[in-house]
């Protein structure tokens, strides 16, 4: 767990063009961490029905606005994009740079694949690599961070490549749908990098809609269906207020298996994404009678119920936000919990199966 995580608060940084941006404060971080929230990214994460090119398009507005902010703060000067295949293809970094008049000097490509022996994962291997070095530049990356193994593997490879060329990076800007593990990993990496690049400014990490958590190893969740180190949920994370508000304004999104599911499958192998979502909801339907609904609610909201306003503020890391906003969000959550009393998990599962198959019928083989 991240040191001093309980002391971390989110504070508003800007609100512009429909994009809310928050900065993490109070963690004695070596790096900078931001959370951005925007209508299309909220839709992407609340509705697994968003598939194909729309997955990419959903991230354009938030990414472009953040690029503009970073350019104005002089965090990005000369840019070099690192595309870690295939997850990076969902992130509109080049398009956002173009929109915000940021010159992209080069684009590098890498792929990292898991190595298995006797059915067990034994490591990661760089399968494809085409790197370009831009001295003293900003490296731009877009990637989902769950366990973070792929990102660390690729970054160490790139940094070693730069060192062999006798050049260095100024900083690294990372756009991610990711979890708390990412903060822990990037703090350690910055310490590691500064041993041989003392002037390295660190990572600027932009999380879409929140810093989520992964189910820990051996934990399949209250439903017994979740995948450890892969599936994202709220508990132990920090959620953008607008995302919390939108999620709890609807009955079902909070109970999805994962906040994002498999980003690559959602865009390129839609039938696999459909299978995963339907497999989950059919699993919930089958075992609904044995799932403790109260425990599931507490797991998904991230805290025991009932909870006082003061404890809720601390748990959400909202103590530095406007009190009118947080009071409203607290009351909304109480209303959501109350409204769930008369709704069965079977009803939710049947509704989701019907909605999902109806919306994505054209993709179902």
Predicted segments with their positions:
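PRPP-associated nucleotide enzymes
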Residues: 1-365
């Amino acid at each position: 767990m991240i040191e001093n995580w309980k002391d971390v608060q989110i504070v508003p940084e800007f609100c512009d063009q429909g994009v809310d941006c928050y900065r993490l404060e109070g963690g004695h971080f070596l790096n900078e961490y931001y959370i951005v929230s925007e209508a299309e990214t909220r839709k992407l994460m609340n509705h697994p029905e968003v598939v194909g090119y729309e997955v990419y398009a959903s991230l354009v507005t938030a990414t472009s606005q953040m690029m503009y902010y970073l350019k104005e703060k002089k965090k990005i000067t000369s840019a070099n994009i690192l595309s870690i295949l295939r997850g990076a293809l969902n992130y509109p970094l080049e398009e956002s740079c173009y929109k915000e008049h940021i010159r992209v000097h080069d684009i590098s490509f890498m792929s990292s694949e898991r190595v298995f022996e006797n059915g067990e994962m034994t490591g990661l291997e760089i399968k494809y690599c085409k790197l370009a070095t831009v001295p003293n530049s900003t490296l731009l990356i877009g990637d989902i961070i769950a366990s973070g193994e792929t990102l660390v593997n690729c970054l160490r490879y790139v940094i070693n490549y730069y060192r062999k060329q006798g050049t260095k990076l100024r900083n690294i800007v990372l756009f991610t749908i990711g979890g708390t593990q990412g903060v822990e990993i990037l703090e350690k990496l910055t310490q590691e990098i500064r041993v041989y690049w003392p002037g390295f400014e660190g990572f600027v990490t932009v999380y879409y809609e929140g810093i989520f958590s992964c189910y820990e190893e051996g934990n399949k969740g209250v439903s017994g269906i979740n995948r450890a180190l892969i599936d994202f949920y709220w508990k132990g994370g920090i959620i953008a207020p607008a995302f919390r508000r939108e999620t709890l304004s609807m009955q079902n999104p909070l109970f999805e298996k994962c906040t994002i599911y498999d980003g690559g499958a959602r865009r390129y192998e839609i039938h696999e994404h459909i299978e995963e979502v339907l497999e989950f909801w059919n699993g919930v339907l089958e075992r609904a009678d044995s799932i403790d609904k109260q425990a599931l609610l507490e797991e998904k909201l991230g805290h025991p119920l009932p909870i006082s306003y003061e404890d809720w503020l601390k748990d959400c890391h909202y103590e530095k936000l406007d009190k009118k906003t947080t009071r409203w969000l607290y009351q909304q959550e109480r209303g959501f919990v109350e409204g769930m009393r008369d709704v069965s998990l079977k009803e939710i599962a049947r509704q989701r199966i019907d909605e999902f198959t109806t919306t994505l019928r054209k993709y179902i083989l």
